[in-house]
Amino acid sequence: MKLIMNWVLAATLLCGAGVFTACSSDDDNSDKTNNISEKIIGKWMVDELDGQKCPTNYKAVITFLSATKAYGSLSDINSDSWNNHASADVVIDGNKVTLTAYENEHIKHVTVTEINTITDKDMTLKSDWKAYLDGKEMINEVYDNERYIRISDDYENDIIGTWEGKVTSSEDEHTDGELHRWEYKANGTYVYYSKENDEWKASNDVMADYFVDGILLCTRWKKTIDSNELREWWEIESIKDGVMKWKALRMREDGTTYTATFEMTKVQ
């Protein structure tokens, strides 16, 4: 599976792989892609890349606010990029959707996409993503046979508060089966607590950030200024009656996958 390299792929992913080709004149295909500027409005999350289920730590969310504006969120697994509701300009022409975003004054990302089908539940697509440094192309990636699913839940506000819980699956790379506690704040930071002598002690990490976009929860933290930055990715399955459930599709080193689960209770 090709690796996602930047948030703009959140925009870019919106259309799968493959170099853009002209729209089909087939009437049936046309029926599946008409009124894209209306159907595309809303929040979408990548579900499959190149025909394979997408691990959670590769997932991106993109929200189309209108036919001309969007924003995307991605905690990039391959770089230091951290994009929380990053904005992008959109141009829609038939089933061709182009997204343009500026990472800074020097780096521009352009994604040309072709939507094959779009419904109220999902869309299948292709994409051709290019990144430019001072006008010079430095990266070009194409994706084929991608699928995005529409996201109706948004837990950005519901997660705020203090939660205690542990992993509920037999396997997960991030947790040890012990109880853990997190306090998620409205400003996009959090406090992690560990238990010492039956008392919860707040950590003093120099960085502890998180974002929720739809159901995607991403965190990053550093213990000290000189330590490596660590990241974690989950999908919020539900928040109801003071109970929050997470799940994540993880990939082992041998390429096989498993589903990790986590459950916690709100304590304040």
State the predicted function of each range.
Residues 3, 16-42, 144-155, 261-264, ...:
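Bacterial Sec-dependent N-terminal signal peptides
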Residues 1-9:
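Bacterial N-terminal signal peptides that target proteins for export
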Residues 54-98, 102, 174-224:
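N-terminal glycine/threonine-rich, aromatic-flanked beta-hairpin/loop signature
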Residues 98-115, 216-235:
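An anionic, turn-rich surface loop/hairpin at beta-sheet edges
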Residues 9-17:
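Hydrophobic helical h-region of N-terminal Sec-dependent signal peptides
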Residues 36-55, 148, 152-175, 208:
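Tryptophan-anchored aromatic micro-motifs
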Residues 128-161, 204-210, 247-268:
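Edge beta-strand at a domain terminus
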